[in-house]
């Protein structure tokens, strides 16, 4: 368990691997969402400076969906196909319930977990000063692992093309009206906002780990995005004003 100044950091890793050289890159994410996949892929392509011809994945819901109920064949999601089209990647996947078809990648997943555990033991602590410090630790571990793989990586890179100059946006854009309770609802989660925004219509950029709220072109708030599909993120400073104006609220 990794902690940030003593607080557990719940997270996953988006792990990308080139099977021939075993070059790998991993980025921290909160879930197996499509935005996590986009962020992890773009971070990996950014490190490589090139793009492969094929993008192979398992049957994560970020990439595929059931064609019909019952666990049969699955099809690629439209968003995933748009991602592949943007980078001119040919999407491929494994058969349902056949993880051995990604044996090399699955093996690298296990090696990565053991490598991180060893580096944390050598570090002497699983606690980090900030999420950025932990991300830098991950990057150092990845760079060290990739050191001996450079010869084969050079062969792979020689067969690749540069990625497009413009990455995909790593957020979804939504609109939300601020309620009389000084809250908005995004993806089934309730978030409080400053009471001065009551009644306003906000543009919300939904990133994998944060929400950015705009009134017109002005960014008025940035809040951490909650995990899960229900709950509330309430800052009492946002709602205490309206409550104080209500007789008997306290």
Give residue spans per PLM region.
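Short conserved beta-strand segments at catalytic cores or DNA/RNA-binding microdomains
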Residues: 8-22, 56, 83, 112, ...
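Two-metal-ion RNase H-like nuclease active-site motif
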Residues: 1-3
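Active-site-proximal acidic segments at structured loop/helix or strand boundaries
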Residues: 109-208, 218
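RNase H-like two-metal-ion nuclease catalytic core shared by retroviral integrases
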Residues: 57-58, 70-71, 89-114, 129-132
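Two-metal-ion acidic nuclease core segments, chiefly of the RNase H-like superfamily
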Residues: 72-91
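Active-site beta-loop-alpha junctions of metal-dependent nucleic acid enzymes
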Residues: 9-11, 26-54, 73, 226-232
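Protein C-terminal end segments and domain termini
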Residues: 211-250
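Acidic/histidine-rich, metal-coordinating catalytic segments
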Residues: 50-72
């Amino acid at each position: 368990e990794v902690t940030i100044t003593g607080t557990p950091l719940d997270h996953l890793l988006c792990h990308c691997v080139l099977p021939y050289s075993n070059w790998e890159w991993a980025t921290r994410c909160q879930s197996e969402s499509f935005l996590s996949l986009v962020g992890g892929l773009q971070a990996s392509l950014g490190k490589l400076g090139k793009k492969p011809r094929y993008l192979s994945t398992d049957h994560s819901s970020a990439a595929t969906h059931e064609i019909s109920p019952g666990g049969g064949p699955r099809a690629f999601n439209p968003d995933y196909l748009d991602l592949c089209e943007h980078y001119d990647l040919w999407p491929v996947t494994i058969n349902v319930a056949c993880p051995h078809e990604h044996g090399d990648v699955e093996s690298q997943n296990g090696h990565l977990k053991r490598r991180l555990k060893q580096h944390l033991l050598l570090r002497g602590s699983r606690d980090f000063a900030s999420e950025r410090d932990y991300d830098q630790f991950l990057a150092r571990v990845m760079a060290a692992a990739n050191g001996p793989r450079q010869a084969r990586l050079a062969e792979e890179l020689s067969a690749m093309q540069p990625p497009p100059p413009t990455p995909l946006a790593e957020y979804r854009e939504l609109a939300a009206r601020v309620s009389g309770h000084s809250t908005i609802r995004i993806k089934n989660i309730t978030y409080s906002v400053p009471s001065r925004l009551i009644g306003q219509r906000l543009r919300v950029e939904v990133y994998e780990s944060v929400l950015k709220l705009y009134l017109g072109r002005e960014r008025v708030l940035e809040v951490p995005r909650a995990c899960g599909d229900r709950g509330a993120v309430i800052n009492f400073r946002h709602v205490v004003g309206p409550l104080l104006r209500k007789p008997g609220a306290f």
